[in-house]
């Protein structure tokens, strides 16, 4: 049944206008973005089909075009709409924390870094440069590939910290496997980096590993 044949009170766009976006299901929100379905399948049904096939919203928004192109109704135009929506969410979160200024807690950093790194399908190592009041100066993605002592170059991180006149920083990388448990290489790289930064009086506040649905904090776990 076409959405236009639904009672007005049940249509996603009308529900959003009448109340707010937070009351809509994931499928309904996607339907608002894509606007139309395909023959015999309305936008909500189509979105629900994609979510069921991929295992949820995160998998849908993080997948590349090659993976999504086999789903019916998901062409280049729809893919671009979904990617744009996901990127807007990441930028909104980042700018909200930047306007807030000081990072109030580890959870603030985890929330920001999760949004920035979760969607990558290979490992990415990033730095959040902070001033002496733990206000965000800059966020940068520095290294790509397997994260270990050989691939994470303290010299480059030190150079960027000095450039930003940073007093402290938080580093993070993602685990594409979805499991955020630290490896021995993660532990060794963290220790090596902490010692290198101490030589220029820059504090390493945390190393956060981003998983599929949660994250791991070296600081919270007493490993820093």
Curated annotation (Swiss-Prot):
Zn(2+) binds at residues 173, 175, 186. CDD domains: MPN_DUF2466. Pfam families: RadC, UPF0758_N. GO terms for biological process: proteolysis. Keywords: Hydrolase, Metal-binding, Metalloprotease, Protease, Zinc. Gene3D superfamilies: Cytidine Deaminase, domain 2. Residues 102-224 form the MPN domain. One of its GO terms (molecular function) is metallopeptidase activity. InterPro entries: MPN (IPR037518), RadC_JAB (IPR025657), RuvA_2-like (IPR010994), UPF0758 (IPR001405), UPF0758_CS (IPR020891), UPF0758_N (IPR046778). Belongs to the UPF0758 family. This is UPF0758 protein CBUD_1789. It comes from Coxiella burnetii (strain Dugway 5J108-111).
């Amino acid at each position: 049944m076409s959405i236009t044949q639904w009672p007005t009170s049940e249509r996603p766009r009308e529900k959003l206008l009448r109340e707010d976006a937070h009351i809509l299901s994931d499928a309904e929100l996607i339907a608002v973005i894509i606007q139309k379905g395909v023959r015999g399948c309305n936008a909500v049904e189509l979105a629900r089909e994609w979510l069921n096939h991929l295992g949820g919203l995160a998998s849908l928004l993080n997948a590349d075009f090659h993976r999504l192109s086999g789903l019916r109704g998901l062409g280049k135009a729809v893919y671009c709409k979904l990617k744009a929506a996901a990127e807007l969410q990441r930028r909104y979160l980042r700018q909200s924390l930047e306007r807030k200024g000081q990072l109030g807690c580890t959870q603030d950093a985890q929330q920001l870094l999760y949004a920035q790194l979760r969607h990558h399908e290979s490992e990415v190592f990033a730095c959040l440069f902070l001033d002496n009041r733990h206000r965000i100066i800059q966020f940068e993605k520095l290294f790509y590939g397997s994260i270990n002592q050989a691939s994470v170059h303290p010299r480059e991180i030190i150079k960027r910290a000095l450039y930003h006149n940073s007093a402290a920083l938080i580093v993070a990388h993602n685990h594409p496997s979805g499991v955020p448990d630290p490896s021995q290489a993660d532990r060794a790289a963290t220790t090596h980096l902490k010692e290198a930064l101490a030589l220029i009086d820059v504090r390493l506040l945390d190393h956060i590993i981003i998983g599929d649905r949660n994250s791991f904090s070296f600081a919270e776990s007493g490993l820093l």
